[in-house]
């Protein structure tokens, strides 16, 4: 059993200074003045901000190029989803990347940046089989004490158009995948009903959740949202389905959007948005006001799709705030809530937070306010996972 920890003089969400006692992985006391047990290790917060652990609810840790020579993007025109996928699959074969090595490198960088939870999609196709999945599962096993990870079995190259993929997805679920993924059921597989019926059937058989990539635009994407909601309701999977990206929600007229909002609320479907690209994306404030669960993430980091994303969730919040046109502190903090509490909810973590009894997943970071931390992106002073120090001054310790 680890010694207790006293985290002294920190400001939860920028509020009044206080101290926390961490014991057996939990927050056991919060008070301005705490007398630590004789065996406690004391960490001085120096009135810095205290945030709950950052939650990356949409990652692709299997495909980064971190630690390798710079990759100049080579995706050919017209740069559709299919073009990115084909280019990526070719380069992964040529570069002979170790998914375990690359995913472990990304996770350690994320831990240094205050990330305590990751939901990662992992490519499963008939070229690589389960190799990428197995590499990520190895990383999860090695770092499970330092980070909570969920794995989504993801048919990035298509499913129905590549015979054998469905069996591989189901095999991944049997081997421990937490979620089954999907991808653009009309534009990729060209059969939206069969695509969705297939992945929902796998989820229903094995009791896993669904997290579906939906890039399809306008009314085509909106139609897919309707089909997803229908199947969620029919199988009683309310609260167990996430739709990621969902650009269509920012492209349809108000009347249609209102109908979709009703379906999303009724079926407790989570929307994951990270504001990627330069086109429309979901109206996050409006969805939040309708009580639709929201989360965000990094997407792929430094990969064959593009060079820009980083492992830092505060950087993602900053970018998302820019894309939303947010300038007020309360607006930025709303996005930070999505990157913390929102992500923890979608990952089903009921022990998350900054209250007594919560697991001690904590980030100490300089800044007068949470918004300043988002804008300045300073190194994280301390990162704790279940009451264990896992990063200090921007350096991962595991």
Model-derived segments and spans:
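Divalent metal-coordination and catalytic microenvironments
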Residues: 10, 25, 47, 58, ...
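Active-site core of metal-dependent hydrolases
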Residues: 153-163, 174-282, 293, 302
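Alpha-helical scaffold segments that flank or form the walls of functional sites
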Residues: 67-121, 127-142, 168-174
């Amino acid at each position: 059993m680890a010694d207790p920890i006293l985290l002294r003089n920190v400001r939860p969400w920028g509020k009044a200074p206080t101290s926390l006692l961490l014991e057996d992985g939990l927050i056991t006391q919060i008070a301005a003045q705490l007398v630590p047990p004789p065996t406690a290790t004391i960490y001085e917060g120096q009135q810095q901000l205290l945030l709950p652990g950052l939650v990356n609810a949409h990652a692709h840790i299997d495909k980064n190029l971190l630690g390798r020579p710079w990759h100049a993007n080579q995706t050919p025109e017209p740069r559709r989803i299919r073009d990115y996928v084909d280019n990526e699959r070719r380069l992964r074969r040529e570069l002979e990347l170790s998914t375990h090595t690359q995913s472990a490198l990304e996770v350690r960088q994320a831990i240094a940046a205050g990330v305590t939870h990751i939901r990662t999609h992992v490519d499963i196709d008939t070229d690589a089989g389960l190799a990428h999945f197995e590499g990520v599962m190895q990383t999860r096993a090695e770092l499970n004490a330092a980070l909570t990870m969920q794995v989504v079995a993801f048919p990035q190259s298509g499913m129905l158009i590549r015979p054998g993929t469905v069996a591989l997805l189901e095999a991944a679920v049997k081997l421990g995948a937490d979620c089954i993924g999907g991808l653009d059921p009309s534009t990729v597989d060209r059969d939206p009903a069969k695509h969705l019926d297939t992945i929902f059937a796998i989820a229903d058989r094995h009791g896993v959740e669904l997290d579906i990539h939906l890039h399809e635009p306008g009314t085509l994407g909106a139609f897919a949202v309707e089909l997803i909601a229908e199947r969620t309701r029919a199988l009683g999977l309310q609260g167990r389905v996430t739709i990621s990206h969902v650009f269509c929600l920012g492209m349809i007229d108000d009347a249609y959007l209102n109908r979709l909002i009703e379906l999303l609320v009724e079926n407790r479907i989570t929307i994951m948005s990270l504001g990627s690209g330069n086109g429309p994306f979901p109206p996050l404030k409006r969805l939040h006001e309708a009580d639709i669960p929201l989360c965000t993430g990094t997407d792929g980091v430094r990969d064959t799709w593009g060079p820009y994303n980083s492992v830092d969730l505060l950087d993602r919040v900053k970018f998302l705030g820019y894309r939303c046109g947010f300038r007020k502190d309360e607006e930025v903090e709303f996005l930070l809530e999505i990157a913390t509490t929102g992500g923890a909810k979608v990952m089903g973590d009921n022990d998350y937070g900054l209250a007594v009894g919560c697991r001690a997943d904590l980030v100490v970071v300089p800044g007068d306010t949470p918004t300043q931390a988002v804008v300045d992106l300073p190194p994280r002073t301390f990162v704790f996972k279940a009451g264990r120090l896992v990063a200090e001054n921007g350096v991962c310790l595991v």
